[in-house]
Regions:
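Intrinsically disordered, low-complexity Pro/Gly/Ser/Thr-rich segments with frequent PxxP/GP/PP motifs
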Residues: 73-106, 196-223
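Intrinsically disordered, low-complexity segments enriched in serine, threonine, and glycine
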Residues: 165-244
Length: 244
């Protein structure tokens, strides 16, 4: 899940990190999950529930965008999904169920596709004292982008643990190459070379059938261990492999 902050003249969008919460948390805007799986068999669409536990009234703007769209971009490239309702009143203690539906059936059938479910909660009123010296008012909006994976019916069902086991690691010079031979997107959790945690950065999510390269400063490691994030947003059991 991506959470960001962007600033425009007279209107400030602040990070939702403090108020967007995972399932089970007691306060904030609670999300049904931290990622969304859209199975190809869902011909009538899927639902996703968002709960307002902030005590404040919001307008919730919801849409699906290409994954990696620039935060705050007013008109990102179209994605083949609609969300209903696209804009809704979001009162305290409301549990709003969104309906997400595929509108074009031209996505690849031999691998997953990834998009972003963009959720922007805009307060119905500015907070007291939010007016700046110039007279502009600050509007504090919470925005989250969750990964939405389209999973074609043609794919063989593979558990998250099996996807983790399928990953292939090898050393080439000072780089660790990680290959994903599956038709699924795989998000790495924690990777360790010997006992040292590897800094992954943008290489954390592997596209289907792709390879990423991670720089490994220091001595050549003898082994690697890893886990991945499953469909529920939780880490799988750790796997390990010799690099000899």
């Amino acid at each position: 899940m991506r959470v960001w902050a962007s600033v425009v003249m007279g209107c400030f969008f602040l990070s939702a990190a403090a108020q967007a919460t995972a399932p089970g948390d007691s306060a904030g805007i609670a999300l049904e999950s931290t990622r969304v799986i859209y199975p190809g068999s869902a011909t009538k669409g899927i639902s996703f529930t968002v709960t307002n536990r902030t005590g404040q009234m919001y307008l919730l703007q919801s849409r699906v965008v290409p994954w990696g769209a620039v935060p705050g971009e007013s008109s990102p490239a179209a994605a083949p999904f609609i969300v209903v309702p696209p804009l809704a009143r979001f009162a305290p203690d409301d549990a709003l169920t969104l309906r997400i539906r595929l509108t074009k059936h031209d996505l690849p059938t031999d691998r997953e596709s990834v998009f972003g479910l963009s959720l922007k909660a805009i307060p119905s009123q500015s907070a007291p004292g939010s007016e700046s010296e110039s007279g502009a008012k600050m509007v504090l909006a919470l925005q989250n982008n969750l990964k939405l994976f389209y999973r074609p019916t043609e794919l063989a069902e593979i558990t998250a643990e099996a996807r983790a086991q399928a990953l292939q690691f090898r050393l080439q010079g000072t780089e660790l190459k990680v290959h994903n031979p599956t038709p699924y997107y795989v998000t790495l959790g924690e990777v360790k070379a010997d006992s040292k945690t590897v800094v992954l950065g943008e290489e954390r999510m592997l596209a289907p059938f792709s390879t990423v390269e991670v720089n490994l400063p220091g001595a050549r490691p003898k082994s690697v261990s890893w886990n991945i994030i499953n469909d529920d947003g939780r880490p799988t059991p750790r796997q390990s492999q010799s690099l000899d």
